[in-house]
UniProtKB/Swiss-Prot annotation:
It comes from the Bacteria. PANTHER family: FRUCTOSE-BISPHOSPHATE ALDOLASE. This is Probable fructose-bisphosphate aldolase class 1. One of its GO terms (biological process) is glycolytic process. Its EC number is 4.1.2.13. SUPFAM superfamilies: Aldolase (SSF51569). Belongs to the class I fructose-bisphosphate aldolase family. It is an enzyme of class 4 (lyase). GO terms for molecular function: fructose-bisphosphate aldolase activity. Pathway: Carbohydrate degradation; glycolysis; D-glyceraldehyde 3-phosphate and glycerone phosphate from D-glucose: step 4/4. The keyword Lyase applies. It catalyses: beta-D-fructose 1,6-bisphosphate = D-glyceraldehyde 3-phosphate + dihydroxyacetone phosphate.
Length: 334
């Protein structure tokens, strides 16, 4: 695939007022979400739930793409249409999560490195034929006593860059996601320092491995107080710190940045994104790639009556997409 096509896909992913829905939970993660609302974790229930999300009427008004899990990209709607085809036909770009999860980094207590590079080229080739046009790889950076280490940051940046280079070789736009985890009692200043170091390392690694930034999307965590921090930063502080950190680390040529919600409440994640747009003078589009913050309320309602609440649950998904789409333009009113 040409650089032009990669760039075109990347730009479509961050089209004005649109974001990406993350529905790439692994089977074990969706099991936790389902058990929380009393749904049995069967393959058919997972398929039906993903169909509920993806067939929401007019979803593409505010959603440009969706990140799928391996199982989902192989599944079909109840009418027998492969999900990836259904999405493409309805103006939503199919994406695929390709990492194999974060594992303990040997010799570095409390730190993780993401696995999944072995055999990745062949997997990406298959995903492209299944209809995927972008991929996602998540690195996990924990904040704690004396961590993260430079070694951990570098190991994850290197893996993200290897993955990104392989994606572009196979015609997929790489979404690179170095998530600085909210857990902990650290303050917003500490989060800023760690996020800045992580992004500097990442973009250095992408440059070294000849990754074309015009065909790459960053999925970033916001600069925010740790969940256990006594002093929680205000919406304005989070927006200002996040934008300042991104401006100091992310090249302006990148087509766009989407944020993960990372354990924020539905309203917090929307308010923070909206506030960033009040600052003006942004070098790149800032949008959203939320999972839980898009799905939680709808899943709860659907679980109570899978048939009777179907349309209502889809209405909630549409409303959440609309709220975040407006926030991605700075027009959300709260």
């Amino acid at each position: 695939m040409s650089i032009e096509q990669l760039a075109e896909t990347a730009q479509a992913m961050v089209a004005p007022g649109k974001g990406i829905i993350a529905i790439d939970e692994s089977t074990s993660t969706i099991a936790k979400r389902f058990s929380g609302v009393g749904i049995e974790n069967t393959e058919e229930n997972r398929r039906a739930y993903r169909e509920l999300l993806l067939t929401t009427p007019k979803l593409s008004d505010y959603i440009s793409g969706a990140i799928l899990f391996d199982e989902t990209i192989r599944q079909k709607t109840k009418d027998g249409v492969p999900f990836a085809k259904y999405m493409a036909d309805h103006g939503i770009i199919p994406g695929i999560k390709v990492d194999k999860g974060a594992q303990p980094l040997a010799g570095m207590p409390g730190e993780l490195v993401t696995e999944g590079l072995d055999g990745l080229r062949a997997r990406l080739e298959e995903y492209y034929t299944l209809g995927a046009r972008f991929a996602k790889w998540r690195a996990v950076i924990n904040i704690g006593e004396d961590i993260p280490s430079g070694t951990c940051i570098e190991a994850n940046a290197h893996a993200l860059a290897r993955y990104a280079a392989l994606c572009q070789e196979q015609g997929l736009v790489p979404m690179v996601e170095p998530e600085v985890i909210m857990d902990g009692d650290h303050d917003i200043e500490t989060c800023y320092e760690v996020t800045e170091a992580t992004l500097r390392s990442l973009f250095g690694a992408l440059y070294e491995q000849n990754v074309v930034l015009e065909g790459t999307i960053l999925k970033a965590s916001m600069v925010i107080s740790g969940k256990g921090c006594e002093e929680q930063a205000s919406v304005e502080e989070v927006a200002e710190s996040t934008v300042m950190c991104l401006k100091s680390t992310v090249p302006a040529i990148l087509p766009g940045i989407v944020f993960l919600s990372g354990g924020q409440t539905d309203e917090q994640s929307t308010a923070h994104l909206n506030e960033m747009h009040q600052l003006g003078n942004l070098p790149w589009p800032l949008s959203f790639s939320y999972g839980r913050a898009m799905q939680q309320a709808a899943l709860k309602l659907w679980s109570k009556d899978m048939t009777g609440n179907y349309a209502k649950a889809q209405q909630i998904i549409y409303e959440r997409a609309k709220e975040n789409g407006l926030a991605a333009l700075g027009k959300w009113k709260g």
